[in-house]
Amino acid sequence: MRLNTLSPAVGAKSAPKRVGRGIGSGLGKTAGRGHKGQKSRSGGGVRPGFEGGQMPLKIRLPKFGFTSRVSMVTAEVRLGELAKVNGDVIDLNALKDANVVTRNIQFAKVVLSGTIERPVTVKGLKVTKGARAAIEAAGGKIEE
């Protein structure tokens, strides 16, 4: 058995309905689209959220909130990902070199997810309480 020889079991898939192919099919002539109107035409239909000219719900409701521009350049680094970094000192440049964070990241925060076995020194990164405890338990330290 090979991937290119796989096929569904006989009778498992029914043939698709072919519309507009005669009266006997039950979907001839108008092909299940009814008579006239925008939805019967080729390419006919309205965009999602359109309410026939009535002011749409999206616009009736007020705007709220914003996206912090700092969040665009901030990354969350899991404790387990610190193992990918070579060397004992882990800073933002070390994370970028190890491809843990992308080049446009300016701030990073280490969170407790996964484990770290070797002692490391975390420099210039924010660290959560749980991650701080785990790093110090492994014999590492955090430098602000």
Swiss-Prot record:
Could you tell me where the Gly residues compositional bias lies? 21-31, 42-52
Read off the Pfam families from this record: Ribosomal_L27A (PF00828)
List all disulphide bridges recorded for this chain. Answer: none
Top-level taxon of the source organism:
Bacteria
Which controlled-vocabulary keywords does the entry list? Ribonucleoprotein, Ribosomal protein, RNA-binding, rRNA-binding
Instruction: Outline the segment boundaries, as ranges, of region: Disordered.
Output: 1-53
Q: Which InterPro entries does this chain map to?
A: Ribosomal_uL15 (IPR030878), Ribosomal_uL15/eL18 (IPR021131), Ribosomal_uL15/eL18_sf (IPR036227), Ribosomal_uL15_bac-type (IPR005749), Ribosomal_uL15_CS (IPR001196)
An example GO CC term for this entry is: cytosolic large ribosomal subunit
Q: Which GO terms describe its molecular function?
A: rRNA binding; structural constituent of ribosome
Any one of the GO BP annotations = translation
**What is the role of this chain?**
Binds to the 23S rRNA.
Show the PANTHER family listed in the entry: 50S RIBOSOMAL PROTEIN L15, LARGE RIBOSOMAL SUBUNIT PROTEIN UL15M
Indicate the family of this protein: Belongs to the universal ribosomal protein uL15 family.
Quaternary organization? Part of the 50S ribosomal subunit.
Protein name, entry field = Large ribosomal subunit protein uL15
**Name of encoding gene:** rplO
